[in-house]
Amino acid sequence: MRQNPARRAALLDAAIEVLARDGARGLTFRAVDAQAQVPAGTASNYFANRDELLTQAGARVYERLEPEGGSPAGSPEERGDRARVAELTHEVVERVSTYRTGFLALLELRLEATRRPALRAVLTERIRADVDANIRLHLGDGRPGDATSVELLHLAMNWLILERLTLPDVFPEARLRELVEQAVERLVPETRGEVPAEG
């Protein structure tokens, strides 16, 4: 059966909305059809089974999280500056937080991956590739710090975003911005080759 790529993308976007709203248990072909406002049976014509739908929904979240115009880069003068790392980190936090349903859907997929080895393999590969790409960009642009700095920022910002989107009253917005600045200051040296001072 011939398939429409735009329709497939719309169905995956609907699946992401269902995951964020109803959790993985609520993700059914019928729920996706209803969310996408398409005739019953449409989603089952595009996806062989629920596992395929879950896996492709995870990939779609990452598609939508990509920055427009590719990876951000500064001028050669600012690429190696810790302030630029802080600026980029704020941009990532804002971009991911703005796509709230995508982040929440990804949390549901992560939980589901603990029970579905195929989904776990796909998410592991995708997230590891994302971390590796961030490391390559960071080092390639001559930014301060090393691969461990990037990995620690990845872990810290993921939890900060989780807190912001699920329990927003724990930290006020102004404090979250300060915490991003502090994370960069403590995890990334001022210049390349230095080790951050002990706090």
Q: Where do the PLM segments sit?
A:
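Hydrophobic/aromatic-rich alpha-helical bundle segments in the mid-to-C-terminal region
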Residues: R120, T124, L139-G199
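Hydrophobic alpha-helical connector segments
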Residues: G69-F103, S149-L153, R177
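Secondary-structure edge/capping motif, primarily at the C-terminal ends of alpha-helices
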Residues: P76, R110-A113, R164-P168
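Solvent-exposed, amphipathic alpha-helical segments
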Residues: A14-R21, P67-E68, A105, L109, ...
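Helix-turn-helix
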Residues: A10, A14-E52, Q56
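Short, basic, alpha-helical segments at the C-terminal edge of helix-turn-helix-like DNA-binding modules
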Residues: A59-L65
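Amphipathic alpha-helical packing segments from all-alpha helical-bundle domains
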Residues: E66, S97-L107, T114-D141, T148-E151, ...
